[in-house]
Amino acid sequence: LQSKMAYTAQITRNTPTAFLFLVDHSISMQKMTSLFGEEMTMAEAAARIVNRQINELVYRCIKSNETRHYYDIAVIGYGERAYSGWNGDLEGRDFVSPEELREHPYKKIITREEKRTRKGVVVKEVEKVQWVEAQHDGSWTHLHEAFSKAQQLLNQWMEKHHDKDCYPPTIINITDGEFNGATRESLLQQANELKSMFTNDGNVILFNIHFTASKSAAEVVCPIEISELRGNSYAETLFNMSSLLPERYNADISR
């Protein structure tokens, strides 16, 4: 790595970055959870989170009605195997551009979202574009297969951008944490291998979003200590897989 401060590269068309969403499609994701005060399956909540983030990424690329190629975006669904998670015209694709996403929406739905107003936070109904459908039909939760596919895609992406000062790719894994088919130790090793990949601007970032069906469990955001997870073994494993949040973001998170 270069000696300059990491995670400071400007994201441009010449120096893009990448986002990979890994989405648990196993049958255990049919359990119920809550998102913005609305009861739904974990699979539906995962799909809404991914679609919402993609909406935001695409919106940030629109300049004077031109959709600029700031990011490459991939969705990997996983159950017994790992596969492209796109629906509609993009089905079967791996990385796609913001322009392709803007031109090929899957469908539109009405969702409830928190909006900040002068009177505080309110929940409003909004129309949102979807590219990813909720799924919970996998008999297994082979996270190791998703990690392997993510590494394959990132190897290809890094080869294409290795000589550029690109902000490192970000991996976001969304799951209830009930993985099987591989040991905890081997999954931690795979996670470490992903996090050891790097661009000139820093190492790949791996985040995990963990769903629980427990209505009594309080939401934990960006835990600093493993003790904050109150002994939930699935959450603890995901915590140990995750990247440390880059220091430059600490001030934003603490607000």
Where are these regions (language model features)?
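Acidic, low-complexity intrinsically disordered regions
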Residues: 1-255
